[in-house]
C-alpha cells in the first residue's frame, strides 16, 4: 500500500472524473479536467529538467492554478514550496535560496518582486506566470505564461514510481523569523493532516482506496477554505476534499460579504477560517446584510471550522445565535505536528471554554522531564506529538534536534506550545513559549521585526511583543529606546520597516522608553516589555488600526 499524495488524488479522480473539483469565480474544473491540466504541468516541469525531489515554488493566491500546481508538482515527483505572497524581496530571496528552489509558478502581479529576486537566486531556472489581469512585465526574466506553456505537453498519467517515503515540505516561520521547511513523509502528513485518520474515532483509514470509495458512495460536500493556501491548514482542507471527491470553492482575496455570497450561491457545507481575524468581519458582514433586510440562503452550511488560531467564545456564541444548529470547531496544531486537538461547540452543548481542547491520543502534555502531566495538577507542560511526525527541518540539523526530541524511548515533535491538563483530561492552551506573536493566524517572530526597527537611524534598541487586539487576537507592539535627541514616530518606523518585512509584521502601536531592559548577557527581557505595554497606554497607535485594546 503506497500512501502517496499523488496516488490518493488519482484514486478519487478515477472514481468521480465528471464531478466538479474546483470552483473559483466563474471558473470550474471537474476532476478529469484537473487531472489533465496537472498531468500537462508535471510533464512540462520534467521537460524543463525538474527531477525527483527538486523544489518548485507556488507563489499564488487561492485560485484554480494553485491547486493544479500542487497536484502537478507531486505528480512530477517534485516537492512544492509554499511561498507567502505577502513576502517582500528579502524574505523571498531567503526562501528561494533556503529551499534550493529550481522552478517557480507565480501570479503576474508579483512579477516586479520576482524580477528583483531572481538575479540573486540562480538555481531558479524555470518560471511559469499565471495571468491575473495585471500587466507587470515577466518576459524580462524569461517567464512564460502558464497555460500556453503546459498546453504543448502530454495529458497522460505516465510518471515514475512513487513512495509513501516521498517528502512533502511545509514552510513555516522559524525562531529567527525566517521560514523553516518542515519535512514530512507523504504517509505521515496524510495520517495527521490530510485525512488519513478518522478525526471522530482517532483510528487510521485502513486502505488507500477507502477515501475514493467514499467519493463514489456519497454526494460531494462543498468546502470553502478562506485562509491562503500557504497555510498547512488550507492545504489540509483542500487535499482532504480532493481525496474524497468533494468540491473546493476558492477565494483569492478575503472578502466577508463575498464569502457569504459564495456560501449562498454554491451551497457550501463547510467553511474554514482563521480565528477572530476572519470571524469578526464575517459576523459583521452577516449582521449588516440582515439589518439591511436581506437574507442569504445558508441552509446548506453545517460546519464552521477555525484553524491556525483559536477564536473567542463570544464570537462563537454570536454565530450560533445567527446560525443555530451549526457545529463550531477550532483546532490546535502546527506545521510540525499536524492536528493535535479540537474544541467543538454546537447549539445545546456547553462551550469548552477559551483555548481549551480535547487532544488526540498521540498528543501529550509533558513536564520538563518528559513525563506526562497529571490531569488537574495545575502543572504547566509542553505540547508534544508522537506517532506520525516529521523527519525534521530541511537543512537545519540544530533546529531539528531542538524540536524533535526523544523521551523514554519515544520520539516527539515539540514546537513550543505550553498547556495545562484539566481534571477532565481536556487541555488549556497557554501559548507559545518562544514569545511568538499570533496575529490573525500569522505567526510573527520578534527578532525579525526588532532587527528591522533597529536599522532605523533614530532607534537605539527595540523589543516587540504581542498586545490584545479585538479583530486579530494580537497585533505587534514596539517598545523602543530612541537614540539621544531623537524621537521616531510610528509613521516613520512603519515606512522604514515595510521595506524589510511583510506588512502584517509591521508594529501597530509604539511605546517609547528611556531604556530597553536586557539581561547582563544582553538577552531581551520580554516580560518587562509586556509589562510596559500593560502598565500604560501606547504613545502612538496606528491611525488606520482599529480593534486595539
State each model region's role.
Residues 130, 502-523, 546-548:
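AMP-binding/adenylate-forming catalytic domain of the ANL superfamily
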Residues 190-226, 230-272, 285, 289:
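Conserved AMP-binding/adenylation subdomain of ANL enzymes
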Residues 17, 152-171, 177-178, 213-222:
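Conserved pre-ATP/AMP-binding loop-to-beta segment of ANL
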Residues 47-48, 75-148:
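Structural core segment of the AMP-binding/adenylate-forming
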Residues 147, 243-244, 268-273, 283-352, ...:
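Gly/Ser/Thr-rich phosphate-binding loop
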Residues 358, 371-404, 442-444:
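Conserved ATP/PPi-binding loop(s) of AMP-dependent carboxylate-activating enzymes
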Residues 87, 93-96, 104-106, 261, ...:
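AMP-binding/adenylate-forming catalytic core of the ANL superfamily
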Residues 18-63, 67, 71, 88-93:
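Conserved AMP-binding/adenylate-forming core of the ANL superfamily
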Amino acid at each position: 500500500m503506497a500512501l502517496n499524495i499523488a496516488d490518493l488524488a488519482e484514486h478519487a479522480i478515477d472514481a468521480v472524473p465528471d464531478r466538479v473539483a474546483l470552483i473559483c469565480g466563474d471558473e470550474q474544473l471537474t476532476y478529469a479536467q484537473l487531472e489533465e491540466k496537472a498531468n500537462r504541468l508535471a510533464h512540462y516541469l520534467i521537460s524543463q529538467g525538474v527531477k525527483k525531489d527538486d523544489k518548485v515554488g507556488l507563489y499564488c493566491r487561492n485560485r484554480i492554478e494553485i491547486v493544479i500546481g500542487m497536484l502537478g508538482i507531486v505528480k512530477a515527483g517534485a516537492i512544492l514550496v509554499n511561498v507567502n505572497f505577502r513576502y517582500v524581496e528579502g524574505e523571498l530571496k531567503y526562501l528561494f535560496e533556503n529551499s534550493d528552489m529550481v522552478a517557480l509558478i507565480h501570479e503576474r502581479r508579483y512579477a516586479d518582486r520576482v524580477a528583483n529576486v531572481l538575479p540573486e537566486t540562480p538555481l531558479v531556472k524555470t518560471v511559469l506566470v499565471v495571468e491575473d489581469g495585471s500587466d507587470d512585465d515577466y518576459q524580462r526574466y524569461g517567464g512564460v505564461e502558464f497555460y500556453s506553456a503546459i498546453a504543448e505537453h502530454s495529458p497522460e498519467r505516465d510518471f515514475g514510481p512513487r513512495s509513501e517515503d516521498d517528502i512533502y515540505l511545509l514552510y513555516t516561520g522559524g525562531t529567527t523569523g525566517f521560514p523553516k521547511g518542515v519535512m514530512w513523509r507523504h504517509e505521515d502528513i496524510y495520517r495527521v493532516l490530510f485525512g488519513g485518520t478518522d478525526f471522530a474515532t482517532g483510528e487510521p483509514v485502513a486502505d488507500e482506496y477507502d477515501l475514493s470509495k467514499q467519493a463514489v458512495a456519497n454526494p460531494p460536500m462543498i468546502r470553502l477554505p478562506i485562509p491562503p493556501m500557504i497555510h498547512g491548514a488550507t492545504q489540509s482542507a483542500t487535499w482532504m476534499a480532493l481525496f474524497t471527491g468533494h468540491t473546493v470553492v476558492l477565494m483569492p482575496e478575503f472578502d466577508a460579504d463575498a464569502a457569504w455570497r459564495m456560501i449562498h450561491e454554491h451551497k457550501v457545507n463547510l467553511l474554514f477560517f482563521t480565528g477572530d481575524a476572519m470571524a469578526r468581519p464575517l459576523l459583521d458582514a452577516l449582521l449588516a446584510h440582515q439589518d439591511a433586510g436581506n437574507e442569504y440562503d445558508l441552509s446548506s452550511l453545517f460546519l464552521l471550522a477555525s484553524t491556525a488560531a483559536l477564536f473567542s467564545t463570544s464570537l462563537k456564541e454570536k454565530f450560533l445565535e445567527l446560525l443555530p444548529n451549526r457545529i463550531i470547531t477550532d483546532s490546535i496544531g502546527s506545521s510540525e505536528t499536524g492536528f493535535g486537538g479540537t474544541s467543538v461547540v454546537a447549539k445545546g452543548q456547553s462551550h469548552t471554554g477559551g483555548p481549551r481542547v480535547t487532544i488526540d491520543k498521540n498528543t501529550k502534555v509533558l513536564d520538563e522531564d518528559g513525563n506526562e502531566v497529571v490531569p488537574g495538577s495545575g502543572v504547566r507542560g509542553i505540547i508534544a506529538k508522537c506517532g506520525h511526525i516529521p523527519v525534521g527541518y530541511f537543512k537545519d540539523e540544530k533546529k531539528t534536534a531542538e524540536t524533535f526530541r526523544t523521551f523514554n524511548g519515544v520520539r516527539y515533535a515539540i514546537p513550543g506550545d505550553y498547556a495545562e491538563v484539566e481534571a477532565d483530561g481536556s487541555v488549556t492552551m497557554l501559548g507559545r513559549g518562544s514569545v511568538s506573536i499570533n496575529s490573525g493566524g500569522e505567526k510573527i517572530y520578534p527578532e525579525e521585526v526588532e532587527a528591522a526597527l533597529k536599522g532605523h537611524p533614530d532607534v537605539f534598541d527595540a523589543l516587540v511583543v504581542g498586545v490584545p487586539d479585538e479583530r486579530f487576537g494580537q497585533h505587534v507592539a514596539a517598545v523602543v529606546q530612541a537614540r539621544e535627541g531623537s524621537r521616531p514616530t510610528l509613521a516613520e518606523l512603519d515606512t522604514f520597516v515595510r521595506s524589510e518585512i511583510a506588512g502584517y509584521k509591521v508594529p501597530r502601536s509604539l511605546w517609547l522608553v528611556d531604556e530597553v531592559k536586557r539581561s547582563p548577557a544582553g538577552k531581551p527581557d520580554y516580560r518587562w516589555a509586556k509589562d510596559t505595554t500593560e502598565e500604560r497606554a501606547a504613545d502612538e497607535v496606528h491611525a488606520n488600526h482599529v480593534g486595539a485594546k
